[in-house]
Amino acid sequence: MNLEEETRCGYLITAKMKSVWNIQIDLVQKLLEVCKKHDLRIWADSGTLIGTIRDKGYIPWDDDIDLVMMRDDYDKLLAVSNAEFKSPYFFQTAYSEHAPYGHGHAQLRMNGTTAILHGNEHMNIHLGIFIDIFVLDNFPENLNELNNMGQSIEKLHKQLSLRMLNRVIITKKINVMIRSMLMKAELYRDMLRTMFLFYSQVEI
């Protein structure tokens, strides 16, 4: 893909956006290579599917790629991820991070890049340019079982959200404390420097 700025459907596509798209396409090609090797089913979803059919590529204002897999194939991908995705690729899940990840699906990221989404500024995880790999789970046909499943998912989601919120709040407080300490250290350093200059000029 050339990196020249252009306008599509009245929407300006910058060279920077195209460079992100190129990295994401590289990620997709690597993922498809692994899926083909292990006979795993995967397909485009959401805006990526619309863009592929309607726009023969990206939706002009889109900035991500959404792929989806069935649970069996997704679990097989997880099992081979450590062996298949070496640098510059990073296969990210809740199990690959020491800090809370905050997603129920995997993301394939590119080392040496940065893509910090709004609200993720304080997350201490890999934040490289990425593509999303969603998973489709089966739903029970029995309505009672379906309701119970929905309630369990909602409960887990609230617990995870609360843990994430607590971690973000704590991280913000720590960052504020560090900045405060650094400011005090700089102030103390400036005071010492001023005192040194003053007394060095005073005749004793």
Please name every model-derived segment.
Residues G150-H157:
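A contiguous, mid-domain pocket- or channel-lining segment that forms the substrate-recognition surface
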